[in-house]
C-alpha cells in the first residue's frame, strides 16, 4: 500500500500501522464470527425481560416514542428491524450482530492505538468466543461499548485535533446515556474536561462549526426524551436494582427460599419500610448499603478476574471447561507479577503517561459502571464496560513482555485456520433463556410464541411471572404481570376478572409464588381451570410449564 494512503489512514508515523492488517483482522474475526453463529436461529432460544422491551419499543419507534427504557438502544433495534420484522427473528438478529461487532471493534481499537497486530487479533478472537461476550444479558452494553470503541478508532485515524476528539466523545457518551442512564455521569465529567481543555489549551471559536451539528442533535434528543428515565413502571430504577440484588444476596448467604423475580418486592417492603426510592434507603438504612458495598467488592474482583481470563485465553477451544480455573490462577499470578516487578510497573506507567488522554477517557467511561457494581451488584453487563481499559492494559503488558519478537502474518493465518477448525458452535454455550425453575431440556419458548401468534386476531391478556412476555408476540397480547401488576390486597379471581385475563402461563416459579399459594381463589382455579372456561395446553413433556387459555 502506498505510503500516502497509510498516512491518510493513520496520523502517528512513529508507530507501525498497516491499513491492510486492520482490514485483514476485521475480516478474519468476522469470518470466525460467522462460523460461530451458523445455524444460530435453530440452536438458541429466546429470553424476555429487559431485552424484549428494548426490542419492542424499537419496533414501535416513531409511532410510539418511549423515553423510559433505553431510547437510543431502541433506535438501534429500529435500524435492525429494516432487515427483520418478526420479534423472534429480530431478537436473534441483534444477538448475532453484537456477538461479532464487539470483538471486531475491540480488535480495531487495540490495533490503531499501537498494540501489535498479533496481540490485538488474539484478544479479538478470545473475546469472540468468550462467555463474557456470548452469555452477557441484556445485550445493550455490547452496543454501547462497541460504538464507544468505534468512535475512539475514528478519532485516532481521522481526527487530528484533540479538542474535536473530545467533542465527538462527549456526543457519543451523551447518546449512550439514553441507553445506559448511569453514563450521564460520564458525560458530565467528560464535558467538564472538554471545556477545560479547549478554554485552556485551544481556541473555542475554531471548533464551533464542528460542534454545532452534534449540539443540535443533543438538543433534539433532550427535547424528545428529556433526561434518561430514572423510573420503571413508576418505581425508582435504583430502588429496583438495589432491592433485587439485596434479595439475591439474601438467597446466597442466608439460604433464603425466595423467588428473586417476585419476592424481592415483599422482602424490600418488609426490610425497608416507608422507603420508595434508593435515596430513602441510603438515608434510613445507611449501614445496610455500606455492608452491601463491601460484599460487592468481593464479587467485583471475581468479575474482573473472570473478564481478564476471557481476554487472555480462548478456553472454549478446549474440550474440557475446568481448565478455566487454571486461567483464573494464571491471571492472579500475572497481576501479582506486574505489581511486584519494578520494570513492568515502570513500563505500564510510561504507557499510561504516553496515552494519558486515552486513559482518562477510558476511566471516565468505566466509572459509572464501577459505581453501579459496588453500590448495587457487579452484573455481567456492567463488566462489559471494563473490556476497553482491561484489554488495553493487558495488551500493553504483553506487548512489553514479547518486545523484539516479530510474528509474521503467515503464523497468524495458520493459527486462524487452527482456530476455525477447533472453534465451538453456539450449542456449547448455555445461552440466555427464560428461567422457570423447571428441569426441561426440550423447553423452547420460540415454539410457545409461534403458537400464540396464531391467535392474534383479537386482544388477549396473559397472566405470568415472565416480565414483558407479551412483547415477543406479534400483536394483540398484553401482560398482567405477577411481579409488577399484581395487587396483594385483592384475590387472584378479582384481578383476573378486572383485567379480563384469558391466558395464564403456568411455570414452576409461578407455582412457588408465596402470595398465590395462600390465595384460595388461585388454588381453586388451578385445581379446576375448566370450571372457569379455561383449557390446558402442555407444550413440553418433561417439565411443568403449560398454558391455560380461553377460546
Identify the function of each model-found stretch.
Residues 36-55, 64-89, 230-240, 436-445:
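Extracytoplasmic catalytic/substrate-binding loops of multi-pass membrane glycan-assembly enzymes
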Residues 443-504, 508-533:
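Extracytoplasmic
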Residues 55-58, 110, 247-249, 416-470:
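Membrane-embedded, lumen/periplasm-facing catalytic core of multi-pass transferases
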Residues 209-313:
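Membrane-lumen/periplasm interface segments of specific transmembrane helices
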Residues 106-132, 147-148, 161-166:
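Transmembrane-helix signature of polytopic, membrane-embedded enzymes
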Residues 59, 142-145, 179-180, 185-188, ...:
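Hydrophobic/aromatic-rich transmembrane helices and adjacent perimembrane loops
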Residues 25-28, 121, 164-171, 191-192, ...:
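Signature aromatic-anchored transmembrane alpha helix within multi-pass, membrane-resident enzymes
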Residues 39, 67, 71-74, 88-95, ...:
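Aromatic- and kink-enriched transmembrane "portal" helix at the membrane-lumen/periplasm boundary
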Amino acid at each position: 500500500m502506498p505510503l500516502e494512503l497509510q498516512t491518510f489512514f493513520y496520523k502517528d508515523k512513529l508507530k507501525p500501522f498497516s491499513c491492510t492488517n486492520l482490514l485483514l483482522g476485521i475480516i478474519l474475526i468476522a469470518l470466525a464470527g460467522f462460523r460461530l453463529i451458523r445455524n444460530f436461529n435453530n440452536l438458541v432460544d429466546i429470553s424476555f425481560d429487559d431485552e424484549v422491551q428494548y426490542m419492542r419499543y424499537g419496533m414501535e419507534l416513531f409511532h410510539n416514542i418511549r423515553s423510559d427504557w433505553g431510547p437510543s438502544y431502541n433506535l438501534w433495534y429500529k435500524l435492525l428491524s429494516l432487515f427483520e420484522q418478526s420479534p423472534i427473528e429480530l431478537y436473534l438478529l441483534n444477538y448475532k450482530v453484537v456477538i461479532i461487532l464487539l470483538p471486531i471493534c475491540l480488535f480495531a481499537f487495540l490495533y490503531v492505538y499501537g498494540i501489535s497486530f498479533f496481540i490485538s487479533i488474539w484478544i479479538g478472537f478470545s473475546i469472540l468466543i468468550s462467555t463474557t461476550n456470548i452469555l452477557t444479558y441484556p445485550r445493550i452494553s455490547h452496543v454501547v461499548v462497541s460504538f464507544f470503541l468505534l468512535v475512539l478508532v475514528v478519532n485516532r485515524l481521522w481526527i487530528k485535533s484533540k479538542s474535536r476528539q473530545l467533542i465527538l466523545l462527549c456526543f457519543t457518551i451523551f447518546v449512550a446515556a439514553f441507553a445506559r442512564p448511569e453514563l450521564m455521569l460520564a458525560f458530565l465529567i467528560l464535558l467538564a474536561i472538554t471545556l477545560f481543555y479547549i478554554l485552556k489549551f485551544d481556541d473555542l471559536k475554531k471548533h464551533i462549526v464542528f460542534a454545532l451539528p452534534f449540539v443540535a442533535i443533543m438538543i433534539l434528543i433532550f427535547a424528545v426524551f428529556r433526561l434518561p428515565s430514572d423510573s420503571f413502571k413508576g418505581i425508582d430504577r435504583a430502588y429496583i436494582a438495589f432491592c433485587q440484588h439485596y434479595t439475591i444476596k439474601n438467597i446466597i448467604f442466608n439460604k433464603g427460599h425466595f423467588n428473586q423475580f417476585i419476592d424481592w418486592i415483599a422482602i424490600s417492603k418488609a426490610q425497608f419500610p416507608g422507603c420508595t426510592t434508593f435515596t430513602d434507603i441510603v438515608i434510613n438504612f445507611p449501614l445496610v448499603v455500606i455492608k452491601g458495598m463491601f460484599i460487592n467488592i468481593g464479587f467485583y474482583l471475581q468479575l474482573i478476574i473472570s473478564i481478564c481470563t476471557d481476554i487472555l485465553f480462548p478456553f472454549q477451544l478446549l474440550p474440557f471447561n475446568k481448565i478455566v480455573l487454571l486461567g483464573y490462577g494464571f491471571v492472579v499470578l500475572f497481576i501479582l507479577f506486574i505489581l511486584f516487578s519494578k520494570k513492568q510497573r515502570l513500563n505500564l506507567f510510561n504507557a499510561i503517561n504516553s496515552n494519558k488522554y486515552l486513559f482518562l477517557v477510558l476511566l471516565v467511561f468505566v466509572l459509572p459502571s464501577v459505581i453501579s457494581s459496588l453500590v448495587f451488584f457487579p452484573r455481567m453487563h456492567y463488566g462489559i464496560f471494563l473490556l476497553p481499559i482491561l484489554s488495553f492494559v493487558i495488551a500493553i503488558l504483553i506487548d512489553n513482555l514479547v518486545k523484539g519478537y516479530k510474528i509474521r502474518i503467515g503464523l497468524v493465518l495458520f493459527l486462524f485456520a487452527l482456530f476455525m477448525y477447533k472453534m465451538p458452535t453456539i450449542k456449547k454455550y448455555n445461552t440466555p433463556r427464560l428461567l422457570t425453575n423447571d428441569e426441561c431440556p426440550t423447553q423452547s419458548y420460540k415454539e410457545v410464541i409461534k403458537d400464540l401468534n396464531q391467535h392474534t386476531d383479537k386482544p388477549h391478556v396473559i397472566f405470568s411471572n415472565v416480565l414483558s412476555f407479551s412483547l415477543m408476540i406479534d400483536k394483540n397480547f398484553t401482560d398482567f404481570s405477577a411481579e409488577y401488576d399484581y395487587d396483594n390486597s385483592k384475590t387472584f379471581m378479582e384481578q383476573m376478572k378486572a383485567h379480563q385475563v384469558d391466558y395464564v402461563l403456568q411455570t414452576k416459579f409461578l407455582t412457588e409464588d408465596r402470595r398465590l399459594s395462600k390465595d384460595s381463589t388461585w388454588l381453586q382455579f388451578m385445581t379446576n381451570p375448566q370450571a372457569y372456561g379455561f383449557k390446558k395446553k402442555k407444550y413440553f413433556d418433561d417439565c411443568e410449564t403449560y398454558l391455560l387459555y380461553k377460546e
